[in-house]
């Protein structure tokens, strides 16, 4: 019985080990994003609508995969948020804004550190010159939310050379996400702020279709092989134990027959004595 339990436990641990790729986190830096991003809504409401925030915008955010621009964009966001933080540091009535911005700076700095740890040398980038532009709070934090959303889906599986080239006809002014004039609506999760921009969402979905298919294939293959290996181990174990079980059953039957014969012989002797 103990050997049987040992084999069962071994098979369970083997299955868990082989299924490990399925339970890993999808975003490599997702754990760096805290619930403090929910305070962006409050911050945007507190800032004047005509207030301008300087930011170096990376062209191609809506036409290239996220791994092409996220590393550059998060560094520029860190610089802009740090500059914004300094402007509120000495204003007593702006302590609430200061606290929110300070938390956002820490999140972005953690993301910068995470990207440096997972940087890929195989990505060939060819960006146009990045010029500093002025954005309203609504526009700036829409870009911020887009970047945070990208981190939740980002997975560095760039094993082969990947070219990130922005078309020469694309300019920041033509980027619909920057120039959008729709009402600013931020839900508890920053990713939902992009739903009203249907054209950008469609482009994003088409860009990631190929990558998502590859990711599903990469997860499905280990799962399939783990099932095959698990069934193979189970079959081998059953085949190994089957002769022993057969012999055990035969021995039990023989013992029962011997006992019956013994009882009959004993009764026969008692009857003869009587």
Swiss-Prot record:
Residue ranges crossing the lipid bilayer per the database entry: 216-238
Residues carrying covalently attached carbohydrate according to the record: 90, 97, 145, 196, 207
Membrane topology: Single-pass type I membrane protein
Example GO molecular function: stem cell factor receptor binding
Keywords, ordered alphabetically: Cell adhesion, Cell membrane, Cell projection, Cytoplasm, Cytoskeleton, Disulfide bond, Glycoprotein, Growth factor, Membrane, Secreted, Signal, Transmembrane, Transmembrane helix
Localization per record: Cytoplasm; Cytoplasm, Cytoskeleton; Cell membrane; Cell projection, Lamellipodium
Pfam family, one: SCF
Main subcellular location of this protein, as a coarse class: cytoplasm
GO cellular component: cytoplasm; cytoskeleton; extracellular region; filopodium; lamellipodium; plasma membrane
Any Gene Ontology biological process: positive regulation of cell population proliferation
PTM (free text): A soluble form is produced by proteolytic processing of the extracellular domain.
Signal sequence interval, chain numbering: 1-25
Cytoplasmic topological domain residue ranges: 239-274
InterPro entries: 4_helix_cytokine-like_core (IPR009079), SCF (IPR003452)
Stretches of the chain found on the membrane's Extracellular side: 26-215
Family membership noted in the UniProt record: Belongs to the SCF family.
Biological role stated in the UniProt entry: Stimulates the proliferation of mast cells. Able to augment the proliferation of both myeloid and lymphoid hematopoietic progenitors in bone marrow culture. Also mediates cell-cell adhesion. Acts synergistically with other cytokines, probably interleukins.
PANTHER family found in the cross-reference section: KIT LIGAND
Protein name, as recorded: Kit ligand
Organism: Equus caballus (Horse)
Chain's gene name: KITLG
